[in-house]
Amino acid sequence: VSIFLNNNKSFNGSISLLITGDEEGDAINGTKKVVDYLKKKKEKINFCLVGEPTNPNKLGEMIKIGRRGSLTGKIEIIGMQGHVAYPHRANNPSTIIIQILNELKNIKFDKGTKNFQPTNLEITKINIDNNADNVIPRVASATFNIRFNNKHSSGSIKKKINKILSKINKKNKSKFKIDYRVSGEAFLTKQNTTTNMIRNVVKKITKIRPKLSTTGGTSDARFLKNISPCLEFGLVGKTMHKIDEA
């Protein structure tokens, strides 16, 4: 920034650097709060460049031009506890949650788009708190995460999931609870002179023409895209979330 300002004495704008230590997990006390503050102040931001580790193997390989949305759901099925020798006197939530997870996993959300991978659901937890081998449990729970492209919103995904849950639980005469957490909606930054300029600068410095991509997880661009067009470019991310991350 200092070099740029020294070389461009007539520059009449402002350049701000935002450094946050709250980017993972719920990420409520970092970029999100700054974005809310800037909205209240009615600050106009022309462009944001997020320093996310976007490159798979070499610096210059990839620029992120958008991100998939992320929705996590925790399902709880309430059946009826009973003895395994008398299943007609119980209602096994384990069996019901297996039916639900099987149907959820087999949803064909879409085939992907020009810029996005197909929407994907992964089951991340299955919990049945039961220490007895001969007892049908009362409750079974599971957690899943969906990474969705811009053909969907978190709202449309929830509707689809809720319809399946209602159908299967009605059939099995069981009750269910579901809690959702949305980490971000899918977004795509339109290509313009600024995005082309950044791509050309990366090529000039690294001698590699970067691929434009929307792969990977969520980043703080999910907040910044609400106030400004943004791209992501940074270091190589081969060791992200691993021991000795570098």
Q: Which residues are covered by each model-predicted region?
A:
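Acidic/histidine-rich catalytic neighborhood of metal-dependent amide-processing enzymes
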Residues: V1-G66
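Metal-dependent amide/peptide-bond hydrolase catalytic core
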Residues: P53-K58, I65, L71-A246
